[in-house]
């Protein structure tokens, strides 16, 4: 494959964390051969016995995991997903229709690194996690920034800015229209009726009306309703 190139293997200057020999590389289901996997702080690299291989930049890696599912692949391996289409040569130029269909599909490539020593998978995964953490996604950092409208204090002091408007409850009422005030009064009336009904329903005290809590003390708040269960025993 044309994307395989010759380059010197990563070393200590690249922050090499792990070197795993005798590791098969598989790209999108096609075997690339057996070589050495290099997990360095700067990049992830693989080289075969002839010195040909490839390197992956961590910002392009969207997922890595240890796969032990035989239905996905017959051997346990380190799975790596890359946000790019690698290793495929197009024999025919794509048509305009194909380009439109592919616009909404993000290109990905799937790598599987299969070491002969399966006990090394945990160390490979740990090294990948540590190196990936050194290359945070810039988009994640941008999402933490406040993107709301900023109040320019300096511009306000120069008379060029608008002061954000805040109202107290009383001040807010004065800014209501006649329709708004009528709506507010109607809602307040409905609320007061709702509060009253929860204490007395059909002339019978509800469980919630028996006691109210003031300063952490249980107190009786509603007097006994006349004509209702006068012969009942009440504990005081």
UniProtKB/Swiss-Prot annotation:
Coiled coil: none annotated. Pfam families: Voldacs. The modification Phosphoserine is found at residues 95, 143, 192, 194, 197, 209. The modification N-acetylserine is found at residue 2. The modification Phosphothreonine is found at residue 222. GO terms for biological process: chloride transport; negative regulation of cell volume; positive regulation of mRNA splicing, via spliceosome; spliceosomal snRNP assembly. Residues 88-109 are annotated as: Disordered. Its main location: cytoplasm. The keyword Protein biosynthesis does not apply. Residues 95-107 have a biased composition (Acidic residues). Keywords: Acetylation, Cytoplasm, Cytoskeleton, mRNA processing, mRNA splicing, Nucleus, Phosphoprotein. Component of the methylosome, a 20S complex containing at least PRMT5/SKB1, WDR77/MEP50 and CLNS1A/pICln. May mediate SNRPD1 and SNRPD3 methylation. Forms a 6S pICln-Sm complex composed of CLNS1A/pICln, SNRPD1, SNRPD2, SNRPE, SNRPF and SNRPG; ring-like structure where CLNS1A/pICln mimics additional Sm proteins and which is unable to assemble into the core snRNP. Interacts with LSM10 and LSM11. Involved in both the assembly of spliceosomal snRNPs and the methylation of Sm proteins. Chaperone that regulates the assembly of spliceosomal U1, U2, U4 and U5 small nuclear ribonucleoproteins (snRNPs), the building blocks of the spliceosome, and thereby plays an important role in the splicing of cellular pre-mRNAs. Most spliceosomal snRNPs contain a common set of Sm proteins SNRPB, SNRPD1, SNRPD2, SNRPD3, SNRPE, SNRPF and SNRPG that assemble in a heptameric protein ring on the Sm site of the small nuclear RNA to form the core snRNP (Sm core). This is Methylosome subunit pICln. It comes from Mus musculus (Mouse).
């Amino acid at each position: 494959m044309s994307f395989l190139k010759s380059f010197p293997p990563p070393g200590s200057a690249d922050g090499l964390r792990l070197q795993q020999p005798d590791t098969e590389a598989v790209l999108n289901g096609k075997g690339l051969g057996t070589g050495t996997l290099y997990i360095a702080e700067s990049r992830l690299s693989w080289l075969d016995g002839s010195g040909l291989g490839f390197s992956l930049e961590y910002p392009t890696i969207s997922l890595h995991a240890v796969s032990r599912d035989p239905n996905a692949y017959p051997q346990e391996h380190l799975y790596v997903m890359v946000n790019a289409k690698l290793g495929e040569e197009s024999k025919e130029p794509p048509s305009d229709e194909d380009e439109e269909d592919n616009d909404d599909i993000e290109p990905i490539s799937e790598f599987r690194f299969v070491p002969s020593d399966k006990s090394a998978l945990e160390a490979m995964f740990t090294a990948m996690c540590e190196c990936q953490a050194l290359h945070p996604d810039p988009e994640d950092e941008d999402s933490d920034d406040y993107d709301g409208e900023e109040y320019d204090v300096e511009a306000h002091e120069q008379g060029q800015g608008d002061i954000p408007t805040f109202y107290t409850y009383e001040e807010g009422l004065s800014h209501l229209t006649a329709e708004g005030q009528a709506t507010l009064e109607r809602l307040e009336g409905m609320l007061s009726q709702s509060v009253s009904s929860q204490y007395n329903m059909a002339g019978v005290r509800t469980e919630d009306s028996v006691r109210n809590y003031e300063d952490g003390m249980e107190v009786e708040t509603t007097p006994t309703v006349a004509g209702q269960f006068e012969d009942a025993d009440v504990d005081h």
